A protein has these predicted regions:
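Short N-proximal segments of mature Sec-exported proteins
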Residues: 88-102
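Short, glycine/acidic-enriched capping/hinge loops at junctions between secondary-structure elements
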Residues: 42-43, 57-59
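Hydrophobic h-region of N-terminal signal peptides that target proteins for export
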Residues: 8-18
Length: 157
């Protein structure tokens, strides 16, 4: 009996992991669609928005390398927001584009309203999430559409 309970639990866990993995794949596809492939003209960004770190150099970026860099970066961003549970992927995708420090705060920069609401237990974050659509102080419609799509496909109710 214990064996069957253990097997059932493992199968249930595997189903949850697969669901999260498939959502991760959707997030990767969404980022690829909006970021596009960066080449040397977009220095210091390469591949699908990977920012070169000191000491890194990728003179010739293939699609496969760009994809693996995107996945590694997105996993790091999601790990930074692990404490938010189901919202960690959504916050990781946003941080991939705007940076972790804009959300979590650092130095003189305070925490974002989005993070403060989630910490308070309020998951009604649509307005705060889609507010990250500005470039140089002006709202950009294409960025707003991106945020709307990200929220629609990645927010777990």
């Amino acid at each position: 009996m214990r064996r069957w309970i253990l097997v059932g639990g493992l199968l249930l866990f595997a189903g949850v992991v697969r669901a999260q993995d498939s959502l991760f794949e959707v997030a990767v596809a969404c980022i690829k669609r909006y970021e596009g492939m960066h080449d040397s003209r977009h220095h210091p960004y390469v591949g699908y928005g990977h920012k070169l770190l000191p000491g890194e150099s990728f003179p010739a970026m293939s699609e496969k390398i760009a994809d693996s860099l995107l996945r590694a970066d997105l996993r790091k961003k999601c790990a930074a927001f692990r404490r938010f549970g189901a919202d960690s992927l959504l916050l990781g995708v946003l941080a991939y584009n705007v940076g972790e420090s804009r959300l979590l705060g650092y130095g003189n920069r305070p925490k974002s309203r989005l993070v403060r609401k989630l910490e308070a237990g309020d998951r009604d974050i649509h307005a705060e999430y889609t507010a990250y659509c500005h470039y140089r102080g002006k709202a950009v419609p294409s960025i707003r559409r991106r945020r709307e799509e990200e929220f629609k496909i990645l927010f777990i109710k």
